[in-house]
């Protein structure tokens, strides 16, 4: 998974003339997002909600900043 993700990160950075380092995910970020995706898929009954809710959290973080853990918790109502 990580090799594919690294290539996707490099491709994304190149498409917006940025550094791949700008899109680096820590292991904690990966764990948070995978847990959010799991919750979204299981609680909603629709697997398609998993990537969409992760995208929404990414939009919120990009537009307003904030701690990823706090945004994930708010998203799932904790």
Q: What are the residue ranges of the model-derived segments?
A:
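Feature captures hydrophobic
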Residues: 1-78
């Amino acid at each position: 998974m990580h090799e594919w993700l690294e290539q996707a990160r490099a491709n994304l950075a190149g498409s917006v003339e940025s550094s791949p380092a700008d899109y680096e995910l820590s292991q904690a970020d990966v764990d948070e997002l995978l847990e959010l995706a799991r919750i979204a898929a299981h609680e909603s009954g629709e697997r398609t909600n998993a990537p969409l809710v992760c995208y929404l959290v990414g939009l919120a973080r990009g537009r307003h900043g904030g701690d990823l853990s706090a945004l994930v918790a708010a998203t799932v109502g904790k």
